[in-house]
């Protein structure tokens, strides 16, 4: 399926320019230039290539998608691999500042196990960003795909940001931020940018957004890198003359 779509992937992105440009803008807010980035399910490299990584690795199960990615972004290391294969992560000999899982999570057979394997490429400061469609929009997106307004996709799991956060929590991650974005997936001469910037932040209207972003960190990596500390508590009351002696006797 994805191999067949690879030659037309860039055309689909241009056709849905409003959506993809907003997605990239928000990712750029989350990820500073010059970061080390791993993208899982990178497709033709459009997203990771737009983030200017100092060190970038893109993984995709589709060989044809990787061929297209290598044509466009020579400075990024693209690899054909199945992220659910444990050897895929073992072959990565570095940790990353950011790990992006954009629209890929719904195709995984064992989401929690995949998250668990990713601890190996996390350090205390690594942030995992999971971006996914809102289930609310699924019927609309299916209709759009049927009438060729959107790239066709295989059936996938429907997950909201609470589901994703729970799966991350079960795998040993802590959610540090989540946000809904993109309420209007069209440019419309700049109107789309205005609506997405201001209306998607309104609490009630945010539930109508197409996109959710869940940002988390590895608790396993954080606990390994955090220096151990101890507290010594001395309960005192009306013992002004003894406090100095108590402190001096501490080892």
Model-derived features: where do they sit?
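Cell-envelope/extracellular polymer assembly enzymes that use nucleotide-activated donors
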Residues: 228-231
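A conserved beta-strand element that flanks and buttresses the S-adenosyl-L-methionine
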Residues: 100
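Conserved class I S-adenosyl-L-methionine
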Residues: 1-32, 46, 129-151, 189, 242
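A short glycine-rich, Lys/Arg-flanked "PGG" loop and its adjoining helix->strand segment in the class I
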Residues: 112-124
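Short, well-formed alpha-helical segments that are part of the catalytic scaffolds
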Residues: 239-251
């Amino acid at each position: 399926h994805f191999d067949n779509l690879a030659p037309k992937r860039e055309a689909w992105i241009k056709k849905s320019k409003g959506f993809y440009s907003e997605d990239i803008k928000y990712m750029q807010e989350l990820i500073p230039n010059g970061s080390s980035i791993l993208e899982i399910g990178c497709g033709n490299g459009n997203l990771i290539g737009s983030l200017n990584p100092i060190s970038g690795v893109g993984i995709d199960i589709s060989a044809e998608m990787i061929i297209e990615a290598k044509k466009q972004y020579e400075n990024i290391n693209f690899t054909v691999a199945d992220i659910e294969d444990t050897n895929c992560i073992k072959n990565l000999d570095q940790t990353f500042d950011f790990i992006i899982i954009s629209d890929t999570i719904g195709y995984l057979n064992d989401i929690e196990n995949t998250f668990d394997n990713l601890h190996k490429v996390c350090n205390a400061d690594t942030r995992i960003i999971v971006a996914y469609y809102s289930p609310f929009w699924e019927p609309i997106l299916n209709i759009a795909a049927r009438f060729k307004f959107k790239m066709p996709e295989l059936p996938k799991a429907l997950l909201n940001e609470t589901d994703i956060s729970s799966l991350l929590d079960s795998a040993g991650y802590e959610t540090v931020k989540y946000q809904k974005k993109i309420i209007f997936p069209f440019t419309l001469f700049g109107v789309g940018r205005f609506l997405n910037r201001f209306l998607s932040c309104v609490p009630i209207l945010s539930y109508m957004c197409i996109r959710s972003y869940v940002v988390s960190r590895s608790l396993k990596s954080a606990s390994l890198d955090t220096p151990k500390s101890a507290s010594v508590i001395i309960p005192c009351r009306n013992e002004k003359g003894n406090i100095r002696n108590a402190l001096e006797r501490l080892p």
